[in-house]
Amino acid sequence: MAAEVHPTAVVHPGTVLGDGVRVLEHAVVGKQPTLSPRSTAKREPLAPAVVGAGTVISTGAIVFAGSTLGARVIVGDQACVRERVSVADDVVIGRGALVENDTTIGARTRIQADAYVTAYSTLEE
């Protein structure tokens, strides 16, 4: 089953969408981050985002380049998944949650609405 992308959603070039992925209204997938001139973060372009089969990127959500979402993940409305984040299968990221860069989230983890997950975190099953 092909991925379904709403006409108002933005899927950046190179992004990999698995079978049955749904990208809903005004969502953005595969965006390269824009760094401040004073930022000490790495400046090289990131690999494309990868979204596993059956995953839903909800309305207004953002998934940055360099991140990988497993199968059957739900990214809630207006949630944000920053660069170099690895999300395993069957994870729920609640509405308005922010997952900062370089984070690993284990299978079947539930991140509640409006949660803030700091950079370089590991959340296990």
What are these regions (language model features)?
Residues H6-P7, H12-P13, G18-D19, L24-E25, ...:
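Left-handed beta-helix
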Residues T34-L46:
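Intrinsically disordered, low-complexity Ser/Thr- and acidic-rich flexible linkers and loops
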